[in-house]
């Protein structure tokens, strides 16, 4: 059900009524010791965003799409989120439980303007991983790949994601594909033609390196392949293709530094990045220290305020416990200057995703 502009303004205004009071309570506790960066104290109410934002990267319970969407709709007001996007986990053909956008699209269509779906993680991504394994990226494979991508677009996905180039074992298996693989180059062309983005999960690996300490091989590869140069070739292949590099702030190699992000953003105008903070797994090069944005990250977000979006990797329904990913990210978001919040919160999303999303955000007041 499409939300009318009048209803959207009312909803956003209503969601903001409690922000000042709740934020005041948060600031009251800000000077007290906390067990995690930016984490609200146990027992306090959730702290919503100071201004509306789009939660661009979330996942869901594929066995209960209706419950997932109900949970997300309930979260909109609690978070002061204008929209929530669901992405498919990047997967392989031999992994039980693989799925794609078709499991969620019928439910999501009922709530256009509130939730939206990216697709391809369970099929396009699996086709790329299979192609890497077989070495076959010939005309027949490319034809089948393009047909599937265009089928997803006809069904109503607003982008391709979550795709993977270097992904550790977890909910889905370990995955590696060169970001300049022929099927990724083809996907960039398809994305550019249809005006939709690609959302890519890729650990930063400037040169071949051993698997970082703390991770096991198997199931992960013992050595990680260099991928930054190949990633730049993907970005340069079709400058009209908007590429979102997922999870800035959740570094699994030690190389996704603000300096690397800055260099790539300067070099490639079609590159965008999601900000992710996880209170339970900081990883390396975390953007927060004692709840405060580190200066080097604040400078990056400010200097490239037109290139970042919010993507917490939150799961819906929310896991039990107070440490929600969206909350940690909102506490970071609330520290940004108001003009930067406006861009990162909604304006960049409207530009990246185009009119199909921008029309729903036009009435949002930042």
Q: What positions do the PLM features span?
A:
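Alpha-helical scaffolding within the catalytic cores
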Residues: 38-41, 68-72, 97-106, 143-148, ...
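Mid-to-C-terminal alpha-helical segments outside catalytic/metal-binding sites
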Residues: 5-14, 26-54, 67-94, 299-309, ...
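Catalytic pocket-lining loop regions of alpha/beta-barrel enzymes
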Residues: 176-310, 360, 364
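Hydrophobic faces of well-ordered beta-strands that scaffold small-molecule active sites
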Residues: 54-58, 83-86, 115-120, 160-162, ...
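Acidic-and-aromatic substrate-binding clefts and catalytic sites of carbohydrate-active enzymes
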Residues: 60-68, 90-100, 125-127, 136-141, ...
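N-terminal cationic-hydrophobic initiation segments that often serve targeting/anchoring roles
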Residues: 76, 108-112, 153, 235-236, ...
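Active-site gating/metal-coordination segments in enzymes
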Residues: 40-46, 51, 98-206, 211, ...
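Core hydrophobic alpha-helical transmembrane segments of single-pass membrane proteins
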Residues: 14-22
